[in-house]
Amino acid sequence: LDSAGIFVNEKQAVPERSFPQPLRDVTRSPFKEKTMKLPASKLKELKEKFRGDVLLPGDDAYEGARQIWNAMIDKHPALIVRCTTTSDVVLAVNFARNNGLLLAIRGGGHNIAGNAVCDDGIVIDLSRMKSASVDPAARRVMIEGGATLADLDAATQAHALATPLGINSTTGVAGLTLGGGFGWLSRQYGMTIDNLESAEVVTAAGDVVNANATEHADLFWALRGGSGNFGVVTRFEFRLHPVGPDLLSGLIIYPISAAKSVLQQYREFMAKAPDELSVWAVLRKAPPLPFLPAAVHGTGMIGLALLYTGNPTLGEQLIDPLRKFDTPMGMHVGVQPYTAWQQAFDLLLAPGARNYWKSHNFSTLEDGLFDAVIEYIEKLPSPQCEIFFGAIGGATTRPAPDAAAYSHRDALFVMNVHGRWVDPADDARCIGWARDFFKASAPFASGGVYVNFLSADESDRIQNAYGQNYDRLAKVKREYDPDNLFRMNQNILPA
């Protein structure tokens, strides 16, 4: 069974980039960044010292380098520096600070708000810094800040080890981690940040520091959920766990007519599920999955996506109730490589489409929420739009809310309203649908929000994202970045 081929027939036309007015940036700074052309002498000096590439508008690689995952983002930086070493990052940070330039940091370029790129300023592109070193005996991995989830999984699964990551393998490790990070392994092993042992950071002053539980402990605390507010992380060290390499995983697809009953049974099932079992629910139009009859392609569906890390035979027994919530339209469940399951949804989330998200956390799932979900699923504005519930809980709830910057330890489910479409003419309709359902579901939410799911127009929710830890984060920001150099993020103002 090969999940990497689940969506092999999914044909999602992505045209040449075409941009309307972009969503408003929510960047704030105590000084106005310069937008004039930089003197040639300063650029020459930077290029002479820089080991990687320095790209300017008009260079052959510039257009491709400024584009990121979300095609709604259309920004034109004054220069893009593709770093190859930590020394390159130091040079770039100092150059931005000394010249008053707006600074954006690009890891995987997957941020929904488009913070990986900026207008007029400088983009520090880490995508060439992705080397990994695994110590299987110590169960540790060191990986550079430009790596993707696929890079990290490939390195660790060679030793049948893994750390909790997200579910789209093209996502950058850095952005995922700095916002908290959760995925299929999180119920058993916690958030990504709960497995972070140390980080090498280039600060706003251009210093290189190692942050861990004993060195720069305040910075280490802030990095674990405080987004990109405190510096450029050039290397991460993660704790690893025995995982796979082959695990039970797959999809069970039901018709949308059964959605409320399936969601109710899903809620009760997850309340008793062991930490080793992760099940997410997604509602959308059925893509042309090879295991679904052609007659149901494009019709409404609710899917249960699952992974079990234990013995597959026991896992089959545990998931048997999931197969009986109603009459499935199709199933694709079996033992397969963990890395294949990590990449199973990549084609549905390929770069080049237009994306807009709205998200809530939930400590419980109420029937009233299910009614709202069904109402808005019947109004899907495009075949790619969807609503999903990521079940976390388990190990993610056990640390104290102030153990790290990420504070939402009461969240058992993260819901994302994913507007996704191709034609710019559909912008208003798709964004409006996401916003309207977000409002309809708000009465049932627990109040927090996962910072990595905030769109560019949600500056009013930043304090909700950081929760009770905001004031402490602002103090750490004052210590490490008093002038708010790192502000292309869900920004925390220095106290």
Where are the model-predicted features located?
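Short linear/disordered segments characteristic of secreted peptide precursors
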Residues: 13-15
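Soluble FAD-dependent oxygen oxidases
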Residues: 6-11, 21-495
